[in-house]
A protein has these predicted regions:
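A generic structural micro-environment signature
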Residues: 7, 13, 38-41, 49, ...
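Major-groove DNA-recognition helix of helix-turn-helix-type DNA-binding domains
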Residues: 15-45
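Intrinsic disorder/low-complexity segments enriched in polar/small residues
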Residues: 4-6, 25, 59-61
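Polyanion-binding surface elements
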Residues: 1-22, 54
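A short, Lys/Arg-enriched interface patch at domain edges and termini
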Residues: 46-65
Length: 65
């Protein structure tokens, strides 16, 4: 069985609990890395993890300030 390597923007939105439009904005702005695959965007699981970790670090820095 082939292991899934990519997520769609809609799948990432659901994983993060964000709306689709917010997630598309994050992807198009580069906040969440992606590649263009035809008409679609594809996102590696590690890119989602990197985004979450970056947001957590930013929040921790705000709390400690």
């Amino acid at each position: 069985m082939i292991e899934r390597k990519w997520f769609t923007t809609a799948e990432v939105a659901e994983m993060l609990g964000y709306g689709l439009s917010k997630t598309k904005t994050l992807v198009l702005s580069g906040e969440i890395h992606s590649i263009k695959d035809g008409r679609n965007r594809r996102i590696l699981p590690r890119w989602v993890d990197e985004y979450v970790e970056r947001r957590a670090r930013e929040a921790e820095m705000e709390w400690s300030a």
